[in-house]
Structures are given as C-alpha cells and as structure tokens.
Amino acid sequence: MATAVVPVRKRILKEEDMTKIEFETSEEVDVTPTFDTMGLREDLLRGIYAYGFEKPSAIQQRAIKQIIKGRDVIAQSQSGTGKTATFCVSVLQCLDIQVRETQALILAPTRELAGQIQKVLLALGDYMNVQCHACIGGTNVGEDIRKLDYGQHVVAGTPGRVFDMIRRRSLRTRAIKMLVLDEADEMLNKGFKEQIYDVYRYLPPATQVCLISATLPHEILEMTNKFMTDPIRILVKRDELTLEGIKQFFVAVEREEWKFDTLCDLYDTLTITQAVIFCNTKRKVDWLTEKMREANFTVSSMHGDMPQKERESIMKEFRSGASRVLISTDVWARGLDVSQVSLIINYDLPNNRELYIHRIGRSGRYGRKGVAINFVKNDDIRILRDIEQYYSTQIDEMPMNVADLI
C-alpha cells in the first residue's frame, strides 16, 4: 500500500541536525471555519452542537475535511486543541450505520485514553445510533467477544487487546475502512510498534490511515512511509508547541528528600483548583501517596499496575472534582481531558523531553491558563535546560506569589 509517499526531506541529514527540521502543513490543506460548511451529516451535526462545540478548533478546521475525503493524514496538534474530536467526527461521518460491522479502528496507548475516545464517539454520535466498543486490557475477554459479536461500527482500543480479538476472529476486519493511531509518538515507541504492525497486517489493503499526535519525532515520520500512501501533512512547527498560556516554573531542591517538604508547603496552593503530580515510577507514586496521607493530606493516585476498575473509579472521582490532587505516572499524561486541572507538578522531571509537553499539556486545555512547577535537583538542571532549548521556552524560578497565578 505504501508506494507513492511524499518525500519528507530531500537529503539525508546527520543525526544532530534532525532537531532543526520544521515540517510545514501540506499546501492543499484549506481551512473550513465552521462545522456547518464541512459537509457533515445532519444527525452528526446535532451531536456536535449538543456536545457543546460551537466553532471548530484550528486542527479541526484543517483535518476533518481531509480525513472525510479519504486521504491518509498525519496531523500534529498541541494537547488540548481538540485532537480527539477531530478524528471522532471524521470517523462518524464515514460510517454506514446500516452495516453492523466494524468500519473504523482506533488505537491508543492507554486504556484510559481508549475509554475516553469511546465516550466522545458515543456522545458525538448520540443521534446516529452508533455502536462503539472500547477493547482494552484488564477487562473481561468474554465481554469483549460478546460485544464484538453483537456488531460494533467503531472499535477503540489498546494494540495488545485489539490484536488478540482479531486473532480470535472476534473482531472481523473485512469491513474496516479507516485506522486511526492516536498519540502516535507514544504508540510507535518500541512498546507498541510490533503490535501495531500485527494489527495492520490484518486490515484490508485500501484502509485509510490517520496518525495523530502532539509530538512527531523524526523516526515516527520515517515510519509512516511504511503504511501510508501519499499522506497529507497537517503539522505545526515544533517551536509553536510550547504550550501557550501555561506558565512554567522550577523549584531548586538540593536533595531528593527536600522535594517532599516543598510539596507539603505547596499543598494549599494545589487545592485552589485541581492538580496532578507526576512521578517517574509506580513505586514513587505509591511511596509519595502514602507519605502525603501520613502527613494528613488528601490525595488520590493512579498508575498502570492498578486494576482497571480501580483506575476508572479514581478517574471518575477526579473528573467530578471529588478528589483534588492526583499523583500519577505518565499513564495519565496522554490525552486525558480534565478541564479543571490548572496546576501540574513534575515531582520528577520526565525521562524524555517529549513527555514534558504531554504532562504540562494537561493543564490549561482549550486556551485556559495553567501553571507547571518542576522540582529540580542539581543533576536535573541539564535536563531542564535541554527541555527549554527543545521547546524554545523559558522556565523561571518559582515566585513566592505562585498561588495568584493559578
């Protein structure tokens, strides 16, 4: 399938030059300023407006029409700009509701994100009688098989469970017209790469592929050659990916132990709205949660080792505002939409700079203001400077009046 591919660059660059490459949006992409002028079906438009959307965001104005046309699309957009709705609207528009077979497959890196995509599809497709199932690990296989046998127009899921269902012949692929890879940078990272290829091999040869992410490292664009045909690119320059409207600060802590005291001092500030605290390991999340509770602070926590049911109820509590401070690993950083979150604390700086934007992109969604505070030990200074340089941004020392900025 991947034969005629637009060359992404003219010459082979040495590794260190890669960071300077800027990818522009393809010339044939036009802007459609309203949902009404996108040629969408009436029952879908009703769902869009009922969901509370009024005007399409920048990525929606550019990508939806191209996806509906059937083009393979690489779309890059900041966290919090409506990426999920971009492909959900496009998928719903392309369905034949009369045909009770899976016509679109959406892969996501985490169970939570797949579950959220399913919710958005069902909400936007509320007037269409759409059947949509989230196919995710950590849930009952029998339930998946039953739901898939019933007939689902769209399946959203994590690559491992989706491939399992295809192998068991519960998920039939013959009617699939579209494959969407959400948070593709994370998915195509080593962990999911093989599983995506496994899934892809079972899809009909003419399947349309859409790849969506906030960051597109160079290796990802190289990989798109393998399963995209003449893709249209809707990309923002990386320098614009500093999340505007988010004030970023650091707190210098000489030793690891001091981070905890600093966090306790900040607790009253955290609960002004809602806050997410990121740690790099599951053990650290458990340790910090316990330590905060021992000091009589109310916090909830989440990471990938917790049972699915528990993760869901924690998310629900946090979404409803019942819990105000969530301690998590990067499982949370990918595309989860909680609009009240206006403060992010990196208790540990992320292990790679791409994750930084996903973490702080959690706060200030849809142009809301937000604050990110990084706890920095002496040996983290270099990483912080690297992040600053990579995103052409400035991270200042935290002022005393940080509470006034939230």
Curated annotation (Swiss-Prot):
Keyword Nucleotide-binding attributed: yes
Top EC group: hydrolase
Chain positions of motif Q motif: 33-61
Residues the entry annotates as binding ATP: 55, 60, 77-85, 337, 362-366
Entry's localization field: Nucleus; Nucleus speckle; Cytoplasm
Effect of deleting the gene: Morpholino EIF4A3 knockdown results in multiple defects in craniofacial structures. Fish morphants staged at 24 hpf show eyes reduced in size, and dark and opaque zones in all brain structures. In addition, the otic vesicle and the midbrain/hindbrain border regions are barely detectable. Cartilage and bone staining reveals underdevelopment of craniofacial cartilage, bone alterations, and clefting of the lower jaw. The third through sixth pharyngeal arches are underdeveloped in morphants.
Main localization category: nucleus
Entry's Gene Ontology cellular component terms: catalytic step 2 spliceosome; cytoplasm; exon-exon junction complex; nuclear speck; nucleolus; nucleus; U2-type catalytic step 1 spliceosome
Statement: the UniProt record of this protein carries the keyword Cell division: no
Catalytic activity entry: ATP + H2O = ADP + phosphate + H(+)
Residue stretches making up the Helicase C-terminal domain: 245-406
EC number: 3.6.4.13
Keywords assigned by UniProt, alphabetized: ATP-binding, Cytoplasm, Helicase, Hydrolase, mRNA processing, mRNA splicing, mRNA transport, Nonsense-mediated mRNA decay, Nucleotide-binding, Nucleus, RNA-binding, Spliceosome, Translation regulation, Transport
Domain of life: Eukaryota
Transmembrane stretches, start-end: none
Annotated Helicase ATP-binding domain residues: 64-234
GO biological process, one term: regulation of alternative mRNA splicing, via spliceosome
GO molecular function terms listed in the Swiss-Prot or TrEMBL record: ATP binding; ATP hydrolysis activity; mRNA binding; RNA helicase activity
Pfam families associated with the record: DEAD (PF00270), Helicase_C (PF00271)
Family: Belongs to the DEAD box helicase family. eIF4A subfamily.
Known role: ATP-dependent RNA helicase. Involved in pre-mRNA splicing as component of the spliceosome. Core component of the splicing-dependent multiprotein exon junction complex (EJC) deposited at splice junctions on mRNAs. The EJC is a dynamic structure consisting of core proteins and several peripheral nuclear and cytoplasmic associated factors that join the complex only transiently either during EJC assembly or during subsequent mRNA metabolism.
Oligomeric and partner information: Identified in the spliceosome C complex. Part of the mRNA splicing-dependent exon junction complex (EJC) complex; the core complex contains casc3, eif4a3, magoh and rbm8a.
Name used for this protein in its record: Eukaryotic initiation factor 4A-III
Species annotation: Danio rerio
Gene: eif4a3
